[in-house]
Amino acid sequence: MHTHDDADPLTLLRRAGLPAEVGGEGPLRHVRTLPARQARTAEWPAWVPAEVRAGYRQAGVGGLYTHQAQAAAALHSGQHVILATGTASGKSLGTQLPGLAAICGATPEGAGRPPLETTVLYLSPTKALAADQLEALTELAEAIGPAGPAGGVRPAAYDGDTEPEQRRWVRQHANVVLTNPDMLNVGILPNHRAWARFFARLRYVIIDEAHSFRGIFGSHIALLMRRLRRISAHYGGSPVFAGASATSGDPAASFARLIGSRQEEVLAVTEDGSPHAPVDIYLWESSYSELSGDGDAPLKRSLTVEAADLLTDLVTAGHRTLAFIKSRRGAETIARISSEQLAEVDADLARRVAAYRSGYLKEERRELEDALREGRLLGVASTPALELGIDISGLDAVVIAGWPGTRASFFQQLGRAGRSGQRGAAFFVAGDDPLDAYLLNHPEAIFETRVEDAVTDPANPHVAAPHLLAAAQELPIAPEEAEDVGLFPAGRWLLEALTEQGHLRRRPRGWFFAHDDASAAAWVRLRSDGGGPYTIVDAEDGSVVGDMGSAQAQPQAHPGAIYVHQGRSYLVEDLDQQDGVVLVSRVDPPYYTQARETTSIEVLETAASVEWGPHAVHFGQVEVTSAVVGFQRKALGTSEVLSDEPLDLPPSTLRTQAMWITAPETALSAAGVIPEHIPGALHAAEHAMIGLLPLLTSGDRWDIGGVSTALHRDTGRPTIFVYDGHPGGAGFAERGYELAEEWIRTTAETIRGCPCESGCPSCVQSPKCGNRNSPLEKIAALHLLEGLLESRAG
């Protein structure tokens, strides 16, 4: 392993043969060093049994850091805690210690005696993270030995990979159960009577990587936690919740929303007492290619190619490197390009680079995790799956290809570098889009701005309805529960609506689930838009290649699309939307594909409005109709458009939330927008606004959609719509409405600062535009936005 302990942050670049001059013609735009952090330690609490202390010492833990001690003490006293500190700061110990101590005989504060055989539920967003924690807990349990009334700690996983006979043992004997939201939803809560022993003794619920529960997924988890608390109360329990999280804007408020408690009941522990080596962060701009895009706009080199080049150079120099990118296809492409480049230098190095993403089979995932942990792999290109706390130490460098969506994720990813105590390096490679361009030119927006809050909305009726049905099937909903908005945030009206639809029956004792032969929990789609997962099948031998959610199916698995899995490319031959099957065949094309969509929008209800002079900003409910109408084949490495193919797929409708801006033609004219430029000005402003909204929310531009029109039938004016791409909304458009002035100002700054003449992907072009980025008027869009801001100020 090669390290760079030199205090000069440019040393690693020089050793790896990378450009080391900030500014100028090279790619390096900014260097920032996160300083080293010294350890601050604390004594073991007196209530921790000697056997537990001895077990931790045997595992290499001699003492506690201050944040671990603070969190553990509060949890032991019965207070909910969110421990929001840096990557590799030992959050697991801080959240697990009170539960392990209670199992081994510690008396919780305020209790006359310890509850017999205390149980602990550990919840993680992924099976991989739970498997990693299980391995560590099993070793710790062996070191602790047969302590306390339970005869020791008995950890076990309970997930989709657990065999039936093992499941019975877990229910009857395990006192630390590690699972994920999916299994809690369909396997544990609906079968709570089989878990009566466990729930009667449940004292602690540990939620790992709590910051990852945001948006629609987070709203589902918030309702799942309310169902869990309800079942626990039925068996006489009132568990204490412990959250482990990356840093966030207001962790106590976010965690309180997640678990369904009042904010004052949650303690946020944010002062990190663990040591960390310095990390040098390089903001990296892709160079321009010789090709041009829509409207002859200049094109930068592909983000995946730039990241693959960095991965190759770093691996060649001996640096263990992890490259993050948001998309599955991106991870596969980076790994493939890097392997091909390394094969020209050293065939052995080429075999030590791989991709990691969701959609792999269980055996593939575990093998990759082990290979990276043990150092058999030198380079890995990953989706954010490895952003989470899987124990992978000894990494020298991290490449972050494109903005990961939130500052929390950004700092979580770069925190992977330097985990072995040596100086680390992190590269942020800016993509060719407005948000990345803004951050490249405004590094203070990364390093000197508060980390975002996790946006969740458990009152969203589209999310809440199936959880209400699941709750009613688990236990009838009592009349007093219907009035408890803390338990059921959507309110009593949703119960009445579900009763009217025939899904619930009203009885004197409350509401009962009306379908005797159905599983209500199976109607809850935690990780998708409500449609079931699609299975990807190899047409040649019928083997299962992978899976994907329904939201991905039309854009990524339409006939003619290229689907990539483990470095292998497949051509989609058929998309069976009725049976949820994608039929593919192996190919090796020199191109990738990108879908095009068209969209129309109808205003259903205006919930809020504010006037800015002659302009107005609105928020409300809309119905969006969209269709995938075609796709482009684009050359690998250059993104040159090779062909444009039509598609005939059925349209889909979406009822969601939106914010929209209306601007009368007279005001646009006064701002310098001539009539023939109005469509292009609106269209360009819409694209740039969508690109910048994730800066203010915890969303992603792919979670957000937009429509602009020179005369909308519902508003009667030129209008820009920005909407949430999820049924019922996800809180992003509402956040945009609340922060409209800041959002529009940031958008104007980005367009103004882009050096292109008439628009490019770094300012007003969109990678998912269904109209081939036409018409677009960059300068007119800037006049429009500046006119809005002047009206607001006036």
Language model feature labels by segment:
Residues G160-R201, A371:
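Conserved helix/coil segment N-terminal to the catalytic DExD/H
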Residues A252-I259, E264-S327:
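Conserved interdomain linker/interface between the two RecA-like ATPase lobes of SF2 helicase motors
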Residues P181-I188, H192-Y235:
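SF2 helicase catalytic motif II
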Residues M1-A69, H80:
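Helicase-associated low-complexity/disordered flanking segments
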Residues R423-A426, D432-T449, D457, H462-A478, ...:
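Extended Lys/Arg-rich polyanion-binding regions
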Residues H211-D272:
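Post-DEXD/H (motif II) to motif III coupling segment of the RecA-like Helicase ATP-binding lobe
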Residues G405-F427:
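Conserved SF2 helicase motif VI
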Residues T119-A130, L311-Q341:
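Conserved strand-helix element at the start of the C-terminal RecA-like helicase core
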